[in-house]
Amino acid sequence: MYELLLLALLTRKPMHGYLFIRVINDMIGPFAKVSNGRLYPLLTQLEASGMIATVAEEGRQRTFAITEQGRARFHRLMLDTTSNPGDYARLFWLKVPFFEVLAGGERLYLIDHYLNYCQAHLVHLDGELTEMETYALQQRYMTPSQIAATVQAIRHLHNQWHLDYNDVLALRAAEVTRIELVDGATHGESAPTPVERAE
């Protein structure tokens, strides 16, 4: 995640370490924080691998810029949908502000993948709710109060994913319009039907 964010920020302008920390912590906060011990070794690694380069140095403060090799690496990271699947919801929304670097079809690819990702969670949670209904009828393994508390937690998660799904549908509609107006070509396919929220 931090490699993605560092390269993403450098696609906009050169930055120094202190500014990296401030901006990244604003993006991932309020409780998650990137430390100096995590950031500076990563900067060293990226520079050694040719992804970034020092363009200014004042005392102990160095300003970095992204290289062409770094831009290619960033592009691959943006389109990666298989790494860290359990944390992909967070990664997706961190990518959205940097969609400007992608072609229209690539943006829609990420959006459609995330729609399917949300759908998979909704289908899974629907199955969990059905299972809880079976437990309630059979009164096995769990007490009624335990079942009720579990159902409440599942419904909460379901509502969150349903909201995310609808937000991404709106994002997709905006992207299709943007592609039609700005890129001059329509790449949008029919958006999937939203999964209805479980009652």
Regions found by a protein language model. Give the residues of each.
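Amphipathic alpha-helical dimerization/coiled-coil segments
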Residues: 77-127
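Residues in soluble alpha-helical coiled-coils and helical-bundle/repeat scaffolds
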Residues: 11, 15, 29, 101-102, ...
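Charge-dense, low-complexity intrinsically disordered segments
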Residues: 33, 64, 83, 101, ...
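Positions in alpha-helical segments
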Residues: 4-8, 94, 109, 152
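Mid-protein regulatory/catalytic core that forms ligand/cofactor-binding pockets
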Residues: 108-190
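Long, low-complexity, intrinsically disordered segments
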Residues: 193-199
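Basic helix-turn-helix/winged-helix DNA-binding cores
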Residues: 1-91
